[in-house]
Amino acid sequence: MSVDPMTYEAQFFGFTPQTCMLRIYIAFQDYLFEVMQAVEQVILKKLDGIPDCAISPVEIRKCTEKFLCFMKGRFDNLFGKMEQLFLQLILRIPPNVLLPEDKSQETQSYSEEEFHFLQKEIEQLQEKYKTELCTKQALLAELEEQKIVQAKLKQTLSLFDELENVGRDHGASDFREGLVFLIQNSRKLQNIRENVEKEGKRLKIS
């Protein structure tokens, strides 16, 4: 079988020429085997009609297999020549012929320098895309951080509103007075706690 991939021919036919030849070879080989089996059966029937025949079916089978090997060798030799003719003259697209989908290359051909330039430009665009993607990810991460900060700020403002409401409930006119009131009460609670702790220690000692 040919080792040439013949990719352009495969693009046109939809299959590789080598695959086509292989299928033809298998079909011929199967037909040869079937013919030899049929011939063997005919010979065996003829021998059954001959009285006291010294030729056994085993000998017939050996002769059939030997003849089959001979025919297969001749067939392989002939098929190899036929395959070369098919692949060179019938299933091959001439080098000066373009497929319809490639006709644009006749008027828009590229030199090797232009190809390398386009390849370099593609690489630059890929790098630019990667950079923009990283920038986008960084902006999204920053946006998430801003959302967290905004949520904490909202929570802090809500706490200040609660403190202001507590101050108003106790007679403070604004947030500053309410904060002073809370600080004073906090100090009072701290003093009470210290006194309780001292009293508890004194009772333990006594």
From Swiss-Prot:
Quick one: signal sequence residues?
none
On whether Cell division is a keyword of this UniProt record, the answer is yes
InterPro entries in the record: Centromere_Mis12
Print the keywords alphabetically.
Cell cycle, Cell division, Centromere, Chromosome, Coiled coil, Kinetochore, Mitosis
Which residues, by range, are in coiled-coil regions? 108-205
GO CC list:
MIS12/MIND type complex; nucleus
Q: Which GO terms describe its biological process?
A: attachment of mitotic spindle microtubules to kinetochore; cell division; kinetochore assembly; mitotic sister chromatid segregation
Chaperone: is it a keyword of this entry? no
Its subcellular locations are:
Chromosome, Centromere, Kinetochore
Q: Which family does it belong to?
A: Belongs to the mis12 family.
Q: What does this protein do?
A: Part of the MIS12 complex, which may be fundamental for kinetochore formation and proper chromosome segregation during mitosis. Essential for proper kinetochore microtubule attachments.
Whom does it interact with, and what assembly results?
Component of the MIS12 complex composed of MIS12, DSN1, NSL1 and PMF1. Also interacts with KNL1, CBX3, CBX5, NDC80 and ZWINT.
Q: What is this protein called?
A: Protein MIS12 homolog
Write down the species. Answer: Bos taurus
Organism ancestry? Eukaryota, Metazoa, Chordata, Craniata, Vertebrata
